[in-house]
Amino acid sequence: MSTKRPTMELGTVLVVGGCGFLGWHIVDQLLNFPSETDPSAALPKPQGDAKFDYPKLGDRYPRCIAKVAVVDLRTTHNRLPGAEYHDGDITSAESMLAVFRAVKPDIVIHTATPNVLEGNKPLLRKVNVDGTRTLVEVAGGARGDWGGKCKAFVYTSSSSVVHDTQSDLINVNEEWPLIRGALQQEYYSETKADAEEIVLKYNRASPSSMVTCALRPAGIYGEKDTTFTFKVLEHSAKASPTVLRMQLGENNNLFDFTYVGNIAYAHTLAAYRLLFTHSRYESGQGAPLDHERVDGEAFNVTNDSPVYFWDMTRAAWALTGKVVEPEQVWELPESVLGPIGGVAETVLGLLGKTPRLTRRTVRYSCMTRYYSCDKAKFRLGYRPVVPVDEGLARAVGYVVEQERLAGEKKAL
């Protein structure tokens, strides 16, 4: 049986937001994992601990042949050898035209966004909606000539675009409607939905006949994660053993957690499939059949293996030596904690503070929230490569080693 990895030829790829969490991992994959071959780019992980020993990623994902460029607002951090870097503002057509004239990309992968917890509504709309519109129009040639023609545009949307942040979601597919307006309580999700719609409507509508698609990651985590993994470990570091035994809800709620490397892989697959589709259109062949179409489509991306929310949380704690056995758990009902969270928000809000316990955190800890990724499997050929438990070990190991190194530096 052959062990040769498949190869994807992608031409010149511009990763927008390539110095961010997901963007960095996409660049790493496009460059065939310099993080595993170049000591200057290595991801920190604890040494001599079997819990944090895992096989190399470069032997498991397809090999990419690509020239890689990155544009970000600032590119001084999270750089990888082998990519070229450009500072740029996606809300400025002039700024983007200068980058496109220098790079001349065949493919754009657009991951740039403010943090999901960002409460600045004008910033979210300016970057996620106006910035995406500017970027897709520049890529498609509608904002001026930059000396080339972009063939494919992959947008990183969010699984939250179909969620009202309150309802349970059970094996949800891409046919569910986008949630906006009064029903959408998360403004971030509303702006991502608006941006996704802009990108998909632009499919084959530009002067360059550029094809587009959108990916909707669910529950992203992994090395360099500053949301789920970091916050879960921050809580366990500060909480007493008694507090760690407290569980919001019954832990009967399945939840999607998706390793960042698998999400990056879905982006490279989408880019590859779009290139093939663009060539098909350009050569005068018929349009793809509806059940195989990639362009103009949105795709859920998951690990295809939802887990119980608190099992994932306690597994992260256990990797740092803080083990909570099932018989030690104290279940706290959502019906009681939700109102308490509301009171805490009101009281501390008057003081300009945000409580740890909010109605949002209570609901998220107790809701069922997982998606079907069958469409990505059938049309993109996507399969999660790294399982949930390995992804968690990678994510936790990164945080643990980063904190150890920071402690050593502080002690000097």
What are these regions (language model features)?
Residues 183-213:
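Active-site Tyr-X1-5-Lys
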Residues 204-275, 316:
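NAD(P)-dependent short-chain dehydrogenase/reductase
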Residues 260, 267, 285-288, 298, ...:
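Conserved C-terminal active-site "lid" loop/helix of NAD(P)H-dependent oxidoreductases
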